[in-house]
Amino acid sequence: MPPWLPPLVQMADYGNDWDEYLAALYQRFSIDFLGARPLFDGRPTQLKRHPVSEGKEATFWHFISDGSVEADRLPNLRRCERIAWPRAIMDNCADPCVKMWREARGSSINFHLWCEEAMYLVVVADRGSFVLPWTAYPIEYEHQARKLNARWEKFRT
C-alpha cells in the first residue's frame, strides 16, 4: 500500500454502533472536503450536494454506499472503511502508483484515479472551471482490475 494512504476507519472502532460510525465517517468526509477544499488539476473541488439525505451531501453517500437507484443506495462497509482514501488519492494523483486518465462518458468527462495497489478507484467529474468528486469504491474482482488497466493502457496510447 502507498505510505500516504490513511488507515481504514472501521466500524468496530465505534463499538459497532452504526449511528456513531456514520457520524465519524461524515466528520472525516467534512474535514477532507468541506473544511479545506482541495484543488485538483489546478481547479477548486465542489461537491454534488443533491439529493441531500439526512443532512449529508450526495457525494458523501456515493463514497459510502452503492446501488443504481439514488434513493435506494445501501451502505457498503468496504466503502465506509475507505472514507479517507478519496482525498488522499486525489492529493497524491501524481504518485506513480496512481494511474490517472480522462474519459468521456456520454456528455461528461471524468478523471479516473486507479490505485491498483490498493484496488481502489476514485472518479472525479470535470466541470470546466471546477471538479466534482463523483464516486469512489474498492475494486473487488480481478476482472474489474483488468478492465481498468485496459482503459488505462488505451488512454496512454
Features from the language model and the residues they span:
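Ribonuclease/tRNase effector modules and their secretory precursors
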Residues: 1-157
